């Protein structure tokens, strides 16, 4: 009598014999090969989109901005690195200038030092940016600041500080560079927003408000500049493993100084930077780069708002309790 294990073994052998003796295996291998070739061609096309393009990156010296600089430099972009720290900008510029990418001509980045939160610095910075390579092909509004605190305890000055950095600064810089793009009938404006530009989490009010404003402004901009052949992409990442929470401001304006667990477990900034390059190459309009649960919350907010609000209230209670325990 043949045992069950033997029958399974025989059946498995017959299936493998069938696969290898027919066209199924070559067909499967062919499909895998075609898919791999498609992905390779797609990646090359995305890199070609920014090759020799003038790409401006704000907040370039740390976190996601720094990784975007590395990824776009390796793709052959001519970078204009922007930030507040001249020494850090020059250090990054030297690092990139010394690096090489196989099969790609790379370029020494230009640096422009200014504070995005200073309204008086924007016009001069925009002029300096345009002088670097003569024009701008891609503007990546990446610089930003995060916030942690209860609304009732938060100073209006903190709200203004977050809005100045996350909203008014990027808007002012975009407006300053936009006329040059319109004249050339060419350009791509990118806003690095957040999943919190689509949903609001408790104890993140100033940050969420600034990102909701960012989403709204750049959605309007997209519609208005379409006639000039200018692309606008809003990127909404979830948690990224950077120092964003460490450098966040609190209700009284002091530094938060804590690496949140969700941030520590967030996606690699390198991976997010690569996804941003891919989104630009595909000329996507609105992209959410988040894990399934945060992405689901965006739909839940629309489809089942009552449930979403209850979940947020529960989250607020838990967070409040953990702070007082």
Swiss-Prot record:
Q: Does the keyword field hold NAD? A: yes
Question: Where primarily located?
Answer: endoplasmic reticulum
Q: Which ranges does the record list as Cytoplasmic topological domains?
A: 1-17
Which of UniProt's keywords are assigned here?
A: Endoplasmic reticulum, Membrane, NAD, NADP, Oxidoreductase, Signal-anchor, Transmembrane, Transmembrane helix
> Which amino acid positions bind substrate, per UniProt?
194
A GO CC annotation recorded here is: endoplasmic reticulum membrane
For the protein in the UniProt heading, the enzyme class is oxidoreductase
* Compartment(s) where it occurs, according to its Swiss-Prot or TrEMBL record: Endoplasmic reticulum membrane
Binding-site positions, NAD(+): 62, 64, 207, 211, 242
Claim: Zinc is one of the keywords in the record:
no
The record's EC number reads 1.1.-.-
What SUPFAM superfamilies does this protein map onto? NAD(P)-binding Rossmann-fold domains
Which CDD domains would you find in this protein's record? 11beta-HSD1_like_SDR_c
- Its Gene Ontology molecular function terms? oxidoreductase activity
TM helices/strands, residue ranges: 18-38
Tell me which Pfam families the record gives. adh_short
Please give the residue ranges for the topological domain Lumenal. 39-325
Which residues are catalytic? Answer: 207
The record ties this protein, via PROSITE patterns, to:
ADH_SHORT
Family (UniProt): Belongs to the short-chain dehydrogenases/reductases (SDR) family.
What does the record give as the function of this protein? Putative oxidoreductase.
> Which NCBIfam families has this protein been placed in?
PRK06181.1
Name used for this protein in its record:
Dehydrogenase/reductase SDR family member 7B
- The protein's organism comes out as Bos taurus
Lineage in the entry?
A: Eukaryota, Metazoa, Chordata, Craniata, Vertebrata
Name of the gene this protein is made from: DHRS7B
């Amino acid at each position: 009598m043949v045992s069950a294990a033997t029958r399974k073994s025989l059946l498995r052998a017959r299936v493998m014999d069938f696969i290898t003796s027919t066209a199924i295996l070559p067909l499967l291998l062919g499909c895998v090969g075609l898919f791999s070739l498609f992905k390779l061609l797609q990646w090359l096309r995305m890199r070609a989109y920014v090759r020799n393009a003038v790409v401006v990156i704000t907040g370039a010296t740390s976190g996601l901005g720094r990784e975007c600089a590395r990824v776009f430099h390796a793709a052959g972009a001519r970078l204009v690195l922007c930030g507040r720290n001249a020494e850090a900008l020059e250090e990054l510029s030297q690092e990139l200038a010394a690096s090489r990418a196989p099969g790609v001509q790379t370029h020494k980045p230009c640096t422009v030092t200014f504070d995005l939160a200073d309204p008086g610095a924007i016009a001069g910075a925009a002029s300096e940016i345009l002088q670097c390579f003569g024009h701008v092909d891609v503007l990546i509004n990446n610089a930003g600041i995060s916030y942690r605190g209860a609304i009732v305890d938060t100073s209006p000055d903190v709200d203004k500080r977050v809005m100045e950095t996350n909203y008014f600064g990027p808007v002012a810089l975009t407006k300053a560079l936009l006329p040059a793009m319109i004249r050339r009938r060419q350009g791509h404006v990118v806003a690095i927003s957040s999943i919190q530009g689509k949903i609001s989490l408790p104890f993140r009010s100033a940050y969420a408000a600034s990102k909701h404003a960012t989403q709204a402004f750049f959605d309007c901009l997209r519609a208005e500049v379409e006639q000039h052949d200018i692309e606008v992409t809003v990127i909404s990442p979830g948690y990224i493993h950077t120092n964003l929470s460490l450098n966040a401001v609190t209700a009284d304006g002091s530094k938060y100084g804590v690496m949140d667990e969700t941030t520590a477990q967030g996606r690699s900034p390198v991976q997010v930077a690569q996804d941003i390059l891919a989104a630009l190459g595909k000329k996507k309009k609105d992209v959410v780069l988040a894990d399934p649960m945060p992405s689901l919350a965006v739909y839940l907010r629309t489809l089942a708002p009552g449930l979403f609000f209850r979940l947020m209230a529960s989250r607020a209670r838990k967070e409040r309790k953990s702070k007082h325990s």
